[in-house]
């Protein structure tokens, strides 16, 4: 039981770390010395605000920002709820509330990464016209199945002695 518990905690913490990296880091799109994340366009010397990022034209970018932040927050809240339920649940009960929170986090990651995949090319400046997806984008997509599997594990898991 302790091995399963340690594995689930490690899996959850790894998911949270991946979500933090994907949300904060500036490598969603890369082209040479330029990189773009959800917040800034950067070159080798400085970072600049994304043009028109606060306008209606950038609604997709704001949706990606919101869903990735929400996914990260839900993943962290889910971990604290799991720890709380670990001490409060009766023997034999399932971690349903934690599972729901973690599955919502997975849904938010999937939504944010999907929107960025579909709309990422429509808003980037000329310097990102032929850019490649960066590692933060890949990390976001890796975080999706990890949070999904974590949520499903919580759904199946029962509290034992």
UniProtKB/Swiss-Prot annotation:
Pfam families named among the record's database cross-references: PMP22_Claudin (PF00822)
Functional note: Functions as a key regulator of cell membrane composition by regulating protein surface expression. Also, plays a role in regulation of processes including cell migration, cell proliferation, cell contraction and cell adhesion. May play a role in glomerular filtration.
Compartments reported by the entry: Golgi apparatus membrane; Cell membrane; Apical cell membrane; Membrane raft
Family from the record: Belongs to the PMP-22/EMP/MP20 family.
Protein name: Epithelial membrane protein 2
Any one Gene Ontology cellular component term annotated for this protein: apical plasma membrane
Organism of derivation: Danio rerio (Zebrafish)
InterPro entries per record: PMP-22/EMP/MP20-like, PMP22/EMP/MP20/Claudin, PMP22_EMP_MP20
Signal peptide: none
Tissue: Expressed in the arches, orbits, pectoral fins, vessels, pronephric renal tubules, and glomeruli.
Disulphide bond pairs: none
Topology in membrane: Multi-pass membrane protein
